[in-house]
Amino acid sequence: MISSLHRPTVARVDLEAIQANIDKIQRHLPKKVKTYAVVKANAYGHGAVAVSKAVEDQVDGYCVSNLDEALELRQAGIDKEILILGVILASELQLAIKHQLTITVASLEWLELAKKESVDFSQLHVHVKVDSGMGRIGVRSLAEANQLISILSDMGVQLDGIFTHFATADESDHAMFDKQLTFFKQLVEQLDKRPALVHASNSATSLWHSETIFSAIRLGIVIYGLNPSGNSLSLPCPLKEALSLESRLVHVKQIQAGDSVGYGASYVAAEPEYVGTLPIGYADGWTRNMQGFKVLVEGEFCDIIGRVSMDQLTIRLTKAYPIGTKVTLIGQQGKQVITATDVADYRGTINYEVLCLLSDRIPREY
């Protein structure tokens, strides 16, 4: 998708804030360990290449979701380790080897398919994924893990690491978390052959569960300045939200009592009022259910009225602002702030989703 560079809607990304967030988190950790920056999903909407380059001196490697995300970083000249967290097609192994990418191996069935590929397995770097209770991908028993590692060794593969992922690390109830941690610890301790790198810590566990820090951590949403729990748990160190979302008024008018605005005529004015139009809509990731939420105009909150359209939305203004007036959808104006978590709470979702949904139509400025 082509970025819409010729309309006044933009996501501004503060790379220095991301750098500062990483520094604060690393100083908070009880020990120095290998650090991966998680830049999957276009760095949670912040721009994978720009973020990866900005933090290159602070991290040991990167985590992405799939092969294409890894290739994007390599093609941008990023040469540090890249771990693909998802499962790639066995038929794509040669690409992973060619670009020196580390892949995840999650099952014996996949490994049998991989063995059929004509590649130099001695050049392949892998981490084994353990499903300790998340229920997505990974080996689910010590026997399966030992068998998989044995086959990988026989193939001559570079077995670099083993890892798991927690389902409830950002929740106050620790029962499921404790169950997963115990399972993973016992499995790792009993392996016939233990890889050098062991990691289980994502953003939430790095902040609130230092007992999960083995020899590496994977820092995701926290480096972008957001709380993994939303507002359920307090951050142990202050972070700065790195992304702000701005647009500008492209049309301003006065409507009268009884006039309607938007699809379905779902908003009807009760009295004369000023209405402004912004060039951003649900095709940009600002979803239809944001009707009734607020934006900031000159430091004052203004309501979104009418349904959010594909490309535009309308707001109720306190006066007739001139065309070109800046409007903040996420970020700070004056003393007022709208956070991605505020948006998420209104939508009934999580701050991760809010940022990841911001489409490529919105240019990122650094």
From Swiss-Prot:
Keywords: Isomerase, Pyridoxal phosphate
Functional pathway: Amino-acid biosynthesis; D-alanine biosynthesis; D-alanine from L-alanine: step 1/1
Active site: K40, Y263
InterPro entries, per the entry: Ala_racemase (IPR000821), Ala_racemase/Decarboxylase_C (IPR009006), Ala_racemase_C (IPR011079), Ala_racemase_N (IPR001608), Ala_racemase_pyridoxalP-BS (IPR020622), PLP-binding_barrel (IPR029066)
Pfam families assigned to the protein according to its UniProt record, in alphabetical order: Ala_racemase_C, Ala_racemase_N
BP terms from Gene Ontology: D-alanine biosynthetic process; peptidoglycan biosynthetic process
Binding positions for substrate per the UniProt entry: R136, M310
Reactions that this protein is recorded to catalyse: L-alanine = D-alanine
NCBIfam families to which the protein is assigned, alphabetical: alr (TIGR00492)
Function: Catalyzes the interconversion of L-alanine and D-alanine. May also act on other amino acids.
Name assigned to this protein: Alanine racemase
Native source organism of the sequence: Streptococcus equi subsp. zooepidemicus (strain H70)
